[in-house]
Amino acid sequence: ALDTGASKCIVKDLREEFVRDYCFKALSAGAIYEDNYLLGTALARPLLAYHQTQVALEEGADALSHGATGKGNDQVRFEVTYGAFAPHLQVIAPWREWDIRSREDALDYADKHKVPVESSKRDLYSRDGNLWHLSHEGDVLENVWNAPVKEMFKLTTDPMDAPDEPETIVLAFEQGTPVALDGKRLGPVEMVETLNRVAGAHGVGRLDLVENRLVGIKSRGVYETPAGTVLHLAHRELERLVLDRDTLHFKQSISVRYAQLVYDGLWFSTLREALAAFVDETEKEVTGEVRIRLYKGTADPTGRRSESSLYREDLATFGEGMAYDHADAGGFIRLYGLPERVRAMTRDEVTVDVKAVEITKPVGRPGGETK
């Protein structure tokens, strides 16, 4: 930054805050956009934008700037957060204001002004990487029929080249937050880095999808999220074990709305914070362990246990057991199905009355004739 003309450069290590307060919060909420996207980019933007505003206020700056394009979601995520914490500052968005219309234009500008960048015209993918994921967009992926090329991936092994032997891991959670791997307690950053390495080696965490952007267009992205994929799977399995049916089902609806708020750049909204309070309540008993097998691009749960488990073998068994009396089911079914039985009886009574009318009451024909 200093070499390219900046008068001052401030660097902050936000990794711990990012994983602990953003990724793991979204994990506890079960936030997955459109059933697939684990929100790696969407989670990072409010954190970056918030700290931008704090530095700008501390330094007495009169403007904020970002490098997001005019077609994407990131411009919204940055600027909504700017507005939440520094609404008086001017926003400079070069992609919208300068004569830059493509990645080639941006690369030409960088080359002309001696700005070092990793991309080149031989590799025009638009990538966004952080601890939680690595995304790939653009280039050959803009044709949704084109398959991703093998060389594009950075975090995950091709499942065809992954080890021929599966690897089993055990993840431990405390109140919905991952705290240990294979019996070893890990901090948030170390947890994600380790799982990225372990799961990525088995080709776990690849995702190719077409998503609906906030700005109204569809886009295609290929994502690598090894740690996030495994953690979401394990967390979901543990919740199924410890949450009652009504709470679990209602939380699933909350998860969808939570994910949309994050995707749309509304991390600091009142609604997102209110939903987070609900999530915190549901997670109080989500403590336990989940065993997962990693093998050639797949992650499968093979065991789960918790002191808060609502699963009872003596109730679920198909063998002999005295805890559940099968005869009790008959009364439950009659009461549970009573509304349907009443509706059927009411329907039958109406049908009889209608038939009686058809038989006894003459029906007029044109010309006054009756039958």
Language-model features: locations:
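Nucleotide-activated chemistry modules centered on ATP-dependent adenylation/adenylyltransferase
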Residues: 1-371
